[in-house]
Amino acid sequence: VTATRVDVIGVPMDLGADRRGVDMGPSAIRYAGLNAAIEALGIPTRDHGNIPVRVAEEASPEEARAKYLPIIAEACELLALQVEAVVREGAFPLVLGGDHSIAIGTLAGVARARGRAPGVIWVDAHGDINTPITSPSGNVHGMPVHFAIEAQSVAPERIVFIGLRDVDAGERRAIRELGVKAFTMSDIDRIGMAAVIAEALAITIDGPGSLHVSFDMDGIDPTEAPGVGTPVRGGISYREAHLLMEAVAASGALGSLEITEINPILDRENQTAILAVELVLSALGKTTL
């Protein structure tokens, strides 16, 4: 990590998802000892608290094809402003979700501050590249890549999906047509995580601070990360996830990171949040030896 300080930003967003509880993710990750663990690596932290997000009870879904989109966009704009300010200060933004719709805000903030779109490694069981028209559910957490590309916060040729195993027909089409590099679990089985990582870094990195990692905890196998709203069997292993994060750290290019989709209601004794903290530490440079 090139920055001298890690700035934590919580986004208690659950309007993009069907199952309630993912708004408690930022608290769960903090309870798992995030800030103290980062400080123990010798990196100062600053916690900005949480971005205000309206709760579902005071809002209406409005447009069925993209439920709560205006309210999600409002929170994402506040997040973008905060992330932009952090990056301009020379600090490292660590964003805690919340559902994956928050990536719209994180990526916008990073792109504005750096004056260009970052390369993005997107770890996820799902494609998250539906449009309001192709989405079967109308849930915005399945659309952030579409909206980020539309806003020019990311270029399709500089985003890499890792861990895909549940992809909608419209998403398959979008991935093909846009030329997005996507590694499914079958690809990881076939060529190994190390080869996947090498290719992903080659595609996404373009100088120091040019890499953003957007990590949906449902990318990991549910036996290791049960506390997610949309679990899919056969995911990334504990060891593969750490290998990825250690490689990201070793690249020296990581400029920002977000962890999304932890749902403490569905978790077992906060194990998914504890794993998230371990993965953050690996991404920030913690190694076994």
Q: Which residue stretches match the model-derived regions?
A:
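A short helix-to-beta-strand connector/capping loop
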Residues: 43, 155-157, 177-180
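Short, glycine/acidic-enriched loop or turn micro-motifs at the edges of active sites
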Residues: 102, 125-129, 166, 217-221, ...
